[in-house]
């Protein structure tokens, strides 16, 4: 049989394109901002992870330009060999001080970070225990490791304890959870997770891709939000969301970080973060430190949007209803209905992300909306009016 046979067979993507409701790969002709030019038309952006709006901040953009002029376009090598810039070390040092974790390792992307951390830390005789709604990169890391993976029902602490009880006493265990869940916008039950980890001798890793710049003191993330910075062993995060760039990181003790530097194949065998991306991430981090009010503004706008949607009759996923995060999922349930609604909203000038199974449970398709500290109430009202109108028309 031809290994490419699957490429020629019918697929959901081909079906959606034929039906005129394919929702992916829309091209922008502008900067990533609260309003964008997308496919030749002005759209209000409610689908970006640019939570602090820093992709267009002048100091961030200028830092990238200066780095290109000083270091050139790329590093042409691994951090392990010729690809370490002085600026990489500065970024790691300043991020470590900000997160209050001395051991920082930076990776090329957030996805690569999870794969690189988990595959290095979880050995053949270890167990990794995951929330079912964790990001796909966490599962990729589990698959690349030699350990045994166990999963617990989403935010179900009784089921987490049940999985911990399955780990033999002589084996190591790592609990991995999103801090803020990327689809649902709800927050992990970190106090309970840390308590169970302590009881059963497990370690805790938090993927804070959507928590950095969003939660905690000055935007330090989910562990800071709960006052559990000393009880979370490993943070993972990304530079592509609140820090307006590209890349990812691990924050831990210096001993754990040093081990990962020498054991993580994705770290050792990948080129380092390019100069412009490194510089913009560092500039965005400094901007966040100088302007912690952005975190408060983001929270305020997120609450404004939640109230506005509820008042307009939109059904927000219950677990995210009162969460102080900028991710607000609107239930639309059936796949084709969701795509039709998303297309109509898009055609009327608002970009949202339709999210379908398997990214959601079957029958629970939704519109994932997300917000920036640089949105205005007037823009949100305009967007929410359009969404509510379309949802009523498609009931």
Residue ranges and their predicted role:
Residues 200-203, 210, 215-324:
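Active-site C-terminal subdomain of aminotransferase-like
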């Amino acid at each position: 049989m031809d290994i490419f046979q699957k490429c020629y067979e019918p697929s959901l993507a081909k079906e959606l394109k034929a039906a005129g409701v394919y929702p992916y790969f829309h091209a922008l002709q502008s900067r990533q901002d609260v309003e964008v030019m997308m496919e030749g038309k002005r759209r209000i952006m409610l689908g970006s992870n640019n939570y602090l709006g820093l992709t267009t901040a002048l100091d961030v953009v200028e830092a990238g330009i200066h780095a290109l002029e000083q270091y050139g376009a790329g590093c042409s090598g691994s951090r392990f060999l010729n690809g370490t810039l002085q600026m990489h070390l500065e970024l790691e040092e300043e991020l470590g001080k900000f997160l209050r974790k001395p051991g920082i390792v930076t990776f090329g992307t957030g996805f690569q970070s999870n794969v690189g951390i988990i595959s290095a830390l979880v050995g053949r005789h270890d167990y990794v225990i995951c929330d079912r709604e964790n990001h796909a990169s966490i599962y990729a890391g589990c698959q690349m490791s030699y350990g045994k993976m166990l999963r617990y029902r989403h935010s179900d602490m009784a089921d987490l304890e049940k999985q911990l009880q399955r780990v033999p006493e002589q084996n190591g265990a790592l609990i991995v959870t999103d801090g803020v869940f990327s689809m649902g916008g709800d927050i992990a039950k970190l106090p309970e997770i840390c308590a169970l980890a302590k009881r059963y001798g497990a370690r805790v890793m938090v993927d804070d891709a959507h928590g950095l710049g969003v939660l905690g003191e000055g935007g330090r993330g989910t562990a800071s939000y709960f006052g559990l910075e000393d009880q979370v062993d490993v943070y993972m995060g990304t530079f592509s969301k609140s820090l307006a760039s590209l890349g990812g990181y691990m924050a831990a003790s210096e001993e754990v970080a040093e081990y990962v530097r020498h054991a993580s194949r994705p770290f050792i065998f990948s080129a380092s973060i390019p100069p412009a991306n490194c510089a913009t991430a560092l500039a965005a981090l400094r901007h966040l430190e100088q302007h912690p009010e952005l975190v408060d503004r983001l929270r305020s706008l997120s609450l404004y949007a939640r109230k506005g949607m509820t008042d307009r009759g939109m059904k927000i996923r219950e677990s995210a209803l009162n969460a102080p995060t900028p991710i607000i999922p609107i239930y639309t349930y059936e796949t084709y209905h969701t795509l039709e609604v998303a297309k109509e909203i898009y055609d009327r000038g608002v970009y949202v992300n339709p999210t379908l199974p398997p990214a959601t449970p079957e029958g629970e398709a939704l519109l994932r909306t997300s917000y920036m500290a640089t949105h205005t109430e007037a823009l949100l009202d305009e967007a929410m009016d359009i969404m509510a109108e379309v949802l009523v028309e498609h009931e």
